[in-house]
Regions:
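Enriched for short, Lys/Arg-rich terminal
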Residues: 1-4, 8, 12, 23, ...
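A short, surface-exposed loop/turn module that caps and links secondary-structure elements
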Residues: 31-56
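Residue-level detector of intrinsically disordered/flexible regions characterized by low predicted structural confidence
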Residues: 9, 30, 44-47, 63-65
Length: 86
């Protein structure tokens, strides 16, 4: 099971989301924590300026950006649409 840390930037963006989206985010984080290779999350490595970060899908539009701190620990950095990648 992954240990998850939440950066202040992630918490701020999460708190700005609608309550229904917050619930969806919580569900996907639970899936990610218990099975980080879950196919429906579409976990993938980012490129370019974000090359040391990864992302997984909350839904068709929303992504969570994270980075590995160790094999069993990640830090969630941001949540939002594809503008996160800019």
């Amino acid at each position: 099971m992954l240990e998850i840390n939440y950066k202040p930037s992630f918490i701020c963006l999460y708190n700005e989301a609608e309550v229904s989206l917050q619930e969806e985010i919580k569900e996907k984080i639970a899936l990610f924590r218990n099975k980080n290779n879950h196919k429906s999350l579409k976990v993938h490595k980012l490129h370019g300026p974000l090359k040391d970060r990864y992302s997984f899908s909350v839904n068709y539009k929303i992504r969570i950006v994270f980075r590995y701190l160790s094999k069993n620990e990640v830090s969630l950095l941001a949540v939002g649409d594809h503008d996160l990648y800019k």
